[in-house]
């Protein structure tokens, strides 16, 4: 799709969407996003220029269908996939990608950590993906030195970061906000550092007794990113890993640094979103969202969950979707899904499906709560189909049509039941939706009430349905 769009930009010093937006140029990607979001092109350009919206669109990812992440657009969902040293391969990861896209993932992150040729897996995923692809480059940086922190130097990080850009990665999680002076603040936590990338950087600083190289070389990374239009996803290395650790001094100290880095990236016209927690009690979610907006000048917020309780391994797609819906309502721009396997193992295809549907529900609920134009239209259409007993229309409008039809057909599989005015819950005689109250019914009832003349009945006003 984008081959012709980007051909004229290649070789320019800065090809970022923010750079063009700040020059008053509406790119083809901005125009495409405007149609997808049903928003004016001028608003898209203004939001990208301001930094409140990003369009992750590496110029080397030419089969990408551009999308937007930001407060003015619909709430988005990311799905994580990736091979580990103990499970999966390239073909399985591409299948997970296709499944994630099928069930509505707006972006996908490849979190492969080893066991396969990481470049081969990443290239295959990007080549098959119509949605933006994100990565965490420190994983491959460590793998490139065979897991030896002592052998890992600053240039290794930058080499891998540029390689990912060259391969077409649209956004990269860069753990530049974790500073060496933040590490003592972790001491009082129950779960310490739960970010894999953050853990790698913490080990590096503790071994070398030097500042985080992603922080000290941040401007160099900006120079790389703007040549490819790769977007920062500023990683929250000190995100809380349990309810006890939420909103603590370590998390908030790093968040302040992430705000500073956001403004530094913007000076280079490089797009930024900021990652957030994690594990957060319900009553602290609004605070976390508002604090990020304050510290990071309203750069799009991208949260993992958050999980609102820690006692449900095997069901953390539910514990986190609860928090995700609330985070989206308060202004989070993108939700990173959590699968039932969280804290337990590498998710398989069915786990990807379960996690994604839970998060599409959360994002959609947030859009309704934020009164985004048209957000409830599909709900209303499905409700009309439900009231009319139009089963096939209900399946069609469902987030997961296959699952909806499967559950219906478990007890009433014959085609004739697709015209039935009941399901197996109430049966043919007790479904309340069979009770249809017409205008004629209301007029007749009104006459009866008036004829009885009782004070309490005479005061009843019956409103006809419009």
Curated annotation (Swiss-Prot):
One GO CC term of this entry? cytosol
Report which superkingdom the organism of origin falls in: Bacteria
Tell me, what is an example of a GO biological process annotation in this record?
Answer: thiamine biosynthetic process
One Pfam family this sequence matches: ThiC_Rad_SAM
* Cofactor(s) it depends on: [4Fe-4S] cluster
Q: Which UniProt keywords apply?
A: 4Fe-4S, Iron, Iron-sulfur, Lyase, Metal-binding, S-adenosyl-L-methionine, Thiamine biosynthesis, Zinc
MF (Gene Ontology):
4 iron, 4 sulfur cluster binding; carbon-carbon lyase activity; zinc ion binding
Instruction: Cite the annotated pathway.
Output: Cofactor biosynthesis; thiamine diphosphate biosynthesis
Does the keyword section mention Signal?
A: no
User: What is this enzyme's catalytic activity, as reactions?
Assistant: 5-amino-1-(5-phospho-beta-D-ribosyl)imidazole + S-adenosyl-L-methionine = 4-amino-2-methyl-5-(phosphooxymethyl)pyrimidine + CO + 5'-deoxyadenosine + formate + L-methionine + 3 H(+)
Cofactor: how bound: Binds 1 [4Fe-4S] cluster per subunit. The cluster is coordinated with 3 cysteines and an exchangeable S-adenosyl-L-methionine.
Residues annotated for substrate binding in this entry: 80, 109, 139, 175, 195-197, 236-239, 275, 302
The EC number of this protein is 4.1.99.17
Please tell me where [4Fe-4S] cluster binds in this chain. Answer: 423, 426, 431
The UniProt record gives the binding positions of Zn(2+) as 279, 343
Describe the task this protein carries out.
Catalyzes the synthesis of the hydroxymethylpyrimidine phosphate (HMP-P) moiety of thiamine from aminoimidazole ribotide (AIR) in a radical S-adenosyl-L-methionine (SAM)-dependent reaction.
Which family does the UniProt entry place this protein in? Belongs to the ThiC family.
- Database matches in NCBIfam families: PRK09284.1, PRK13352.1, thiC
Q: What is this protein called?
A: Phosphomethylpyrimidine synthase
Q: Which organism is it from?
A: Synechococcus sp. (strain CC9902)
What gene does this protein come from?
thiC
